[in-house]
Amino acid sequence: NNLSVGYHGKSLIEDVSLCVQRGKIVTLIGPNGSGKSTILKTVIGQLPELSGTVYLDGETMRSRSRNDVARRMAILMTARVEPELMTCRDVVSSGRYPYTGRLGVLRDEDKKIVEQSLSQVDALAFADAPFSAVSDGQRQRILLARALCQQPQLIVLDEPTSFLDIRYKLELLSVLKRMVRENDLAVLLSLHELDLARRISDTVICVAGDRIDRIGTPEEIFTSDYIARLYHLERGKYDECFSTLEFVP
């Protein structure tokens, strides 16, 4: 609510107010460098808010312990995860650590949740493969399964399709949408692919460098005139039929 976000005490975007409800997907779009990741990093507590407040399930983030936050919010950021000597199942199992105590010993109930999470993202077939050996698309599924293992209310994702080809992008977002429906999750994410944002989002938030420029449904946001203005298109246009940016010579 009324967040001011930035780095080293310098505000980049002010008056950021947004709400993510369970069962809904809220997507940040905007030009590269417009501040989408900065907003997400502030929401998850990786960056301190310069002013304003982040609430999680009715209470401020600052008032909650890290373990308490981990039981309510799961995070998938842009940086590649490279755990060594871990199978995909091991990575997913780490999502239960907020519930296991310091020793990290999984109970039978924890193991059951791990298997359910792997099944829900269609990853049982490669669950015992080394995480370092599977494809980028399979890795993202495993990270989604790890997020599910936390049994969160909110999942925050920063450009989760960045390293994926089109097949895996579509598969990943299909899995994510199913997760939202089946688990009543709230999802806040950033995307740079406008066609995917239009397809998956319930609400779209447009970030324009120093402000939130517009919030609306995909139907309200994805118009030729507005997208051209948001992305400063001087020699291009937005195709509403295909949700793509096209170069015009």
Question: Language-model segments: which ranges?
Answer:
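ABC ATPase nucleotide-binding domains
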Residues: 229-249
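Conserved ABC transporter NBD signature motif
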Residues: 52-60, 69
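Conserved catalytic motifs of ABC-family nucleotide-binding domains
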Residues: 151
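Conserved ABC ATPase "signature" region
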Residues: 93, 108-126
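The feature captures the beta-strand-to-loop junction immediately N-terminal to the Walker
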Residues: 29-31
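Helix-to-loop junction immediately C-terminal to a conserved catalytic motif
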Residues: 44
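Catalytic Walker B motif of ABC-type/P-loop ATPase nucleotide-binding domains
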Residues: 155-158
